[in-house]
Every structure is written in structure tokens, then in C-alpha cells.
A protein has these predicted regions:
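Positively charged n-region of N-terminal signal peptides that target proteins for export
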Residues: 1-4
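Bacterial N-terminal signal peptides
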Residues: 6-15
Length: 234
């Protein structure tokens, strides 16, 4: 992806990733900054935009540190790109070097800086590289907390049901600058079958911490989208 970032300095340090084990270990420290880019293609250019977003920016210090997820069901965006920036990010007034191949393919986009876990932890939870395989499915959610309920919503969104039968990968990101939401969550399922089984079991846990009823006690608004991954391919 052609980087949108080139001076404002943004530091990480306020988010966590939740381990995929059914009794999660202590959450790792949130040390890094990520750039979350939601975008929609102009009519007829969705495939071309996806291809453009999947090209690593060789000018970036970490050109391979990003994922591109593609909308399947839910919100109005076509793609979300989550780019790892390291422990801090800088924005300058200087225009990015070279042309942006995605610029004329976008109908709109939104950009938000968030804090999150290390790239190693993010990669593990999202099933990137190594022995990861199959056809993972993701649920990307954004939430804004009710005033005074930030801590409660954090707990709701980061609690994993220890009795859950489906193992998932989970990343929790906290807004630093940009969009109107407070938190973003990404849940990885190993297959559509796992996603279906988890959703079928959801009504039975609605009232528990992290369940449907619980989250709605603390969230002013939310948007959830089912997506697949187009970059990296493995």
C-alpha cells in the first residue's frame, strides 16, 4: 500500500491484544501505533483498488507490515488496510513521494491512528505467515463508548468466554487520532464453519460479560463487518 503518512508525532501505548487461547494469558502491552484506513472504490474499480492497496510501499521502513481485508457483509467500505507504524508515527506537510496508484480509484476513505500490540503479536492473532493457512474470516468492528463507560466497554470488548468452543484470534485497538470511534476490534476465525458455529452459540452468552446485552450497556454506536483477507495471501 502506498503510505499516506510521511510534523505530528503519535505514540502508542494504550491498547491490548487478547490471546486466542480459551483461557487467555495476561494481555501483552500495547507498544505500537497502527494506521487504520477504511476505503470504498468508485463504481467498477473495486478489484483494481484492492490490487493497488496490496502493493507494499518500498519507501516505508516496514513495507510488509500491513494487512488488507475485503468487505463481505456489513458496513459500506470495500477494504480496510491496517498498517503497522512502529512505536510512533509522524505526519508532515510534505506530499508523499511518487504517485498514489489508489488515489483515483477511491470514492472515499477515512484514516485513524490507533495504538495496539507489537507486530509479532498482531501477526500471531491475525494468522499471518508461518504455518498459518486455510481460509480465515474476520469480523471488523468499531465502537464508541457511552460517556463515562470507556473502562466498562473496554472490559466488554476484551473479555473472552473461557467456555467458548471456537478458538479465535483477537486484536483490540484504541483510537489516538482520526475517526469518530473509540475502539476497533478484529476477530479472526479459521473458517466460515467456525464463524457460523460461534454465531449460533452467541444467544446463550448474551447476558454475560462481553455478550450482546453487556456490550450494549456501554456502547453508543457500533459497526461490524465480515471480511476476508487479500493481503498477505498467507
Amino acid at each position: 500500500m502506498k503510505s499516506l503518512l510521511a510534523c505530528v508525532v503519535i505514540l502508542g501505548g494504550t491498547a491490548i491484544a487478547i490471546g486466542s487461547a480459551q483461557t487467555p494469558p495476561a494481555a501483552p502491552a500495547a507498544t505500537d501505533v497502527y494506521h487504520v484506513h477504511f476505503t470504498k472504490a468508485v463504481p467498477g474499480q473495486a478489484a483494481a483498488l484492492g490490487k493497488a492497496l496490496s502493493v507494499p510501499d518500498k519507501a516505508s521502513p516496514m513495507p510488509e507490515h500491513f494487512v488488507v481485508l475485503r468487505h463481505q457483509e456489513g458496513d459500506d467500505w470495500d477494504y480496510v488496510v491496517i498498517e503497522h507504524m512502529g512505536p510512533k508515527a509522524e505526519v508532515t506537510a510534505a506530499a508523499p513521494g511518487g504517485p498514489d496508484p489508489a488515489r483515483d480509484l477511491r470514492a472515499w476513505h477515512s484514516d485513524t491512528f490507533v495504538s495496539g500490540p507489537s507486530w509479532a503479536e498482531f501477526s500471531r492473532e491475525m494468522g499471518l505467515g508461518g504455518s498459518a493457512g486455510g481460509s480465515p474470516v474476520y469480523i471488523v468492528g468499531v465502537q464508541r463508548a457511552i460517556a463515562g463507560h470507556r473502562d466498562q466497554l473496554t472490559k466488554s470488548l476484551t473479555t473472552i468466554d473461557p467456555a467458548a468452543k471456537i478458538v479465535t484470534g483477537n486484536v483490540f485497538l484504541t483510537h489516538l487520532e482520526g475517526g469518530e470511534w473509540t475502539f476497533a476490534t478484529i476477530t479472526r476465525y479459521n473458517s466460515w464453519t467456525d464463524l457460523g458455529a460461534d454465531r449460533a452459540a452467541a444467544p446463550g452468552t448474551a447476558a454475560s460479560v462481553g455478550g450482546w446485552d453487556d456490550i450494549r450497556q456501554h456502547s453508543a454506536f457500533h459497526r461490524d463487518t465480515i471480511a476476508d483477507r487479500i493481503y498477505p495471501a498467507k
